[in-house]
């Protein structure tokens, strides 16, 4: 999951610039995604997740890491892209229900990256997903994700990358 965990904070850190939605609005008059989803953030977020995943692939044969899933370039790419795709889908829905950028949306804020990354992994590399997404692995993903999400958001808020601590 490391390639899925890094893209969101990296997108926040390195983002800015042109919004992905180009300022366009849905039929409800609200922005499609908002200013927080930018092309630079998307590209650099995905690249950061892929880079971390490639590092993981290069060291996965070390005896210390034999218990981790044996990632491939494809699984790493799908996890990184899926994490930000899940975040964008959540942002789209968030705008439709009237929540503004930065507004808290418990559970959706924590698990959007999990839903997006695992769904894309299931679609794009079912063999990898079928072997590696065991009940214990899914359990630990569900337990650790909100804890990591909270810690990263507090750090982002403390260093001024995020406007809100959630």
UniProtKB/Swiss-Prot annotation:
What pathway or pathways are given for this protein in its record?
A: Membrane lipid metabolism; glycerophospholipid metabolism
Query: What does the entry give for GO biological process?
Result: glycerophospholipid biosynthetic process
This protein's source sits in the domain of life called: Archaea
Say if the entry is tagged with keyword Plastid. Answer: no
Question: Which positions, given as ranges, span the membrane?
Answer: 42-62, 73-93, 103-123, 128-148
Q: What is its EC number?
A: 2.7.7.67
Q: Which GO terms describe its cellular component?
A: plasma membrane
Bilayer topology reads: Multi-pass membrane protein
Cross-referenced PANTHER family: CDP-ARCHAEOL SYNTHASE
List the protein's name. Answer: CDP-archaeol synthase
Look up and give the organism this protein is from. Answer: Methanosphaerula palustris (strain ATCC BAA-1556 / DSM 19958 / E1-9c)
Output the lineage of the source organism: Archaea, Methanobacteriati, Methanobacteriota, Stenosarchaea group, Methanomicrobia
